[in-house]
Curated annotation (Swiss-Prot):
Pathway: Amino-acid degradation; L-arginine degradation via AST pathway; L-glutamate and succinate from L-arginine: step 2/5. The keyword Hydrolase applies. This is N-succinylarginine dihydrolase. Keywords: Arginine metabolism, Hydrolase. It catalyses: N(2)-succinyl-L-arginine + 2 H2O + 2 H(+) = N(2)-succinyl-L-ornithine + 2 NH4(+) + CO2. One of its GO terms (biological process) is arginine catabolic process to succinate. The active site is at E174, H250, C368. The lineage of its organism: Bacteria, Pseudomonadati, Pseudomonadota, Gammaproteobacteria, Vibrionales.
């Protein structure tokens, strides 16, 4: 085994629904109150994981959150039995119940930020769960996210787990959706690239006007310090506020990177020429930028198709594959541009699309669904092996989903006490399948 970039995808939870909770995420709001299909959603995610496993990539699975989150609803003043808490919250504040029932943890690009051992001062892999304070429904995730990460990467000889940053607007952190890493080989020192939307302390920085900037410069700097990153190999850049106002709520909706390649839109960053120069200076010779011009692909097309919310991955033969949502194939302008790219041989060699409709309608493409974790040979062996995709796990999880998941959920179903029973039964069995221990509040 050699050092690899593994992908750990989030398993879609049993309460997957369309509550339109994410302001600034156009797909999420436009599908609000639609009827979701959790069983189809989890199977679409599993199909993507299995396909990458079959291609020879190291593919892991991260467990979902416990939802509905009865513990949080009790903290917010709803009392009685669990079924009474559900009934009262739906009666008096259906928005709170929806927020506490969200399956948004499927998008593990927001689970946290990961720095490989080649980049850190102590030579260990560092994890920091994202606090996600910009959206209430996601701000209640980080404690259990930390539990899941610790159960997946438990060996203290190789892995270091930090607490989420303080829950404050000053340190708004959205995890790996605003972070990428460039390197020549995965096991060598890389350049870690942090993208922020605003500065909390310095008012001279520009900021979006219509939609919130979810990541602060101060949060990104704090994570770089916490992970022990080397200053000369760390680059901070500001996302273009204008594209945030057009629905680009995370950097991974307008740019994606891998090894020596940055694939981004022409309007992705503020002072884009300087950003490219800073990255090239830190990386050295051979840094490759594929910049998509606005006259080829508009920001609107990029957001609607999630062109950049794709996975750039290097195959065993050294060629680069891009994993795209099926929406890209269905947009003639985007698909024509992608095929031009492949013909030009400028760093992307192969296109592969997946049908991720259930996730896409809630505002998350292929890149949202995965957390990248670079692992050397010893670290791969130290991972909880029961969380790694295999023929057996794929079959087991599909049968598990058939047993526990509904094929239809609408808003009123979130108040059904039976959904809570079903969800907890599913998660209890999942922790046994994946050998995670008691990671959920209901198991304590």
């Amino acid at each position: 085994m050699k050092t690899v970039e593994s992908n750990f995808d989030g398993l879609v939870g049993p309460t997957h629904n369309y509550s339109g909770l994410s302001v600034g995420n156009i797909a999420s709001k436009s599908n609000q109150s639609g009827v979701s299909n959790p069983k189809q959603a989890v199977k679409q995610g599993l199909e993507k994981m299995k396909a990458l496993h079959d291609m020879g990539f190291v593919q892991g699975v991260l467990a979902p959150q416990e939802r509905p989150d009865i513990h949080t609803l009790r903290r917010l003043g709803f009392s009685g039995s669990d079924s009474e808490v559900l009934k009262k919250s739906y009666q008096y504040s259906p928005q709170l119940l929806a927020a506490c029932s969200s399956a948004s943890s499927m998008w593990t690009a927001n689970a946290g930020t990961v720095s490989p051992s080649a980049d850190t001062a102590d030579g260990k892999v560092h994890f920091t769960p994202a606090n996600l304070i910009n959206k209430f429904h996601r701000s209640i995730e980080d404690q259990v996210t930390g539990n899941i990460l610790k159960a997946t990467f438990s060996d203290e000889e190789h892995f270091v787990h930090h607490q989420a940053l303080p829950h404050s607007d000053y340190f708004g952190d959205e995890g790996a959706a605003n972070h990428t890493r460039f390197c020549r080989e995965y096991g060598e020192q890389g350049v870690e690239f942090f993208v922020f939307g605003k500065s909390a302390f310095n008012e001279s920085y520009l900021a979006p006007k219509k939609y919130p900037a979810r990541q602060t410069l101060e949060a990104s700097e704090a994570i770089a310090r916490t992970h022990g990153l080397r200053e000369q190999f760390t680059v901070f850049a500001q996302q273009n506020p204008d594209v945030i106002d057009q629905g680009v709520f995370h950097n991974d909706v307008i740019a994606v990177g891998n090894k020596n390649t940055l694939f981004c839109h022409q309007q992705a960053f503020l002072n884009q020429e300087k950003v490219k120069s800073d990255l090239s200076d830190s990386y050295g010779s051979g840094f490759n930028v594929i910049e998509v011009p606005t006259d080829k692909v508009s920001v609107q097309d990029a957001v609607e198709t999630y062109l950049f919310n794709s996975q750039l991955i290097t195959k065993a033969d050294g060629t680069t594959l891009i994993i795209l949502p099926e929406h890209c194939r269905q947009n003639s302008r985007v698909w024509a541009y992608l095929n031009e790219l492949v013909e030009q041989k400028c760093g992307i060699d192969e296109l592969h699309t997946f049908d991720l409709k259930q996730s896409m309608q809630n505002g998350g493409g292929p890149a949202c669904l995965r957390l990248r974790v670079v692992l050397n040979e010893a670290e791969q062996k130290a991972v909880n092996q029961h969380t790694l995709m295999s023929e057996e796990l794929f079959t087991t999880l599909n049968l598990w989903a058939d047993k526990h998941y509904r094929d239809r959920i609408e808003d009123k179903d979130l108040a059904d006490p039976q959904l809570l029973v079903e969800s907890r039964a599913a998660l209890d069995e999942l922790t046994q399948i994946m050998h995670l221990g008691s990671i959920y509040p209901f198991q304590k």
